Amino acid sequence: MKTTLAALALAIATAAHAASPMAVRVLDWMLPVPANWTPQVPSSDMRVAQFTIKSEGGSADAAVFYFGQGSGGSVEENTQRWASQFLDDAGKPAKPRIEKGTTGGMPVTWVSLDGRYARGMGTGPQGEAKAKQSLRVAVIETDRGNLFFQLWGDEAAIARQFPLMKMVVSQMKRGA
């Protein structure tokens, strides 16, 4: 019973956040970003959008990366690089979970990783790895090149925010 009530409360909270999104332009697309995602000035030229996220269960961040048409590496190369930054509970490289889908007629590859994470730009851990971290990535194959939409942070926060990320990606629209 408690589990059912907790799941219901989480669903209601998620729906409440999703009910009042703000529109954010990313290149040619409008994204319906949840109200608890605070836009930030992108910290690098590779980021076309960046957010800090208030969430129960810890901290989270999101960013959309764009490297230009034909740049940024393949989905497979990036998945290998992201996986190299994670270790599982046994200290071995974490195995990514991969799902394929579409949004607005564009292919999307979803990559999920959990474990000890040392976020960085290169291959392998960069700095001190933090335990109980998650990374969710949607690689959206647009006609202008790939958009890399990343959500990362504490496992509990990402568990709450990932349904909202999926909503943002599924409802992105060209133009407007």
Regions of interest found by a model, annotated:
Residues Q40, E56, G124-K132, G175:
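Charge-biased low-complexity segments
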Residues L27-D89, E99:
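Secretory pathway targeting signatures of secreted, lumenal, and periplasmic proteins
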Residues A16-P21:
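Boundary at the C-terminal end of the N-terminal hydrophobic targeting segment
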Residues G73-V75, M121-G122, A159-P163:
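A short, polar/proline- and glycine-enriched secondary-structure boundary/capping micro-motif
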Residues W37, D143-A176:
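Surface-exposed amphipathic alpha-helical segments
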Residues E56, F67-Q69, D114-A118, R144, ...:
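Solvent-exposed coil/turn segments that connect beta secondary-structure elements
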Residues M46, T79-I140:
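Signature of long, low-cysteine stretches enriched in small and polar/charged residues
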Residues A6-A13:
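Bacterial N-terminal signal peptides
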